[in-house]
């Protein structure tokens, strides 16, 4: 393999690596957006659960024990 062939091979590999890096970056950006969205949904669900839990806590405190 002469020098020119080696340079062409390296340039080819570099182009392939650039494409791969760009594809990986695109996937990473997409996953980050999905992660942020899931975090927002989780925060909303936790808030809703806490609100619902506080509603049930007041109901249970007012109810007499089951043995009465």
Curated annotation (Swiss-Prot):
Gene3D superfamilies to which the protein is assigned, alphabetical: 1.20.5.300
Entry's family note: Belongs to the SlyX family.
Pfam families attached to this UniProt entry: SlyX (PF04102)
Protein name per its UniProtKB record: Protein SlyX homolog
């Amino acid at each position: 393999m002469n020098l020119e062939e080696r340079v062409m091979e390296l340039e080819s590999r570099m182009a392939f690596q650039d494409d791969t890096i760009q594809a990986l970056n695109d996937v990473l950006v997409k996953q980050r957006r999905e992660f942020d969205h899931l975090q927002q949904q989780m925060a909303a669900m936790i808030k809703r659960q806490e609100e619902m839990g506080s509603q049930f806590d007041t109901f249970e405190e007012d109810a007499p024990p089951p043995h009465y």
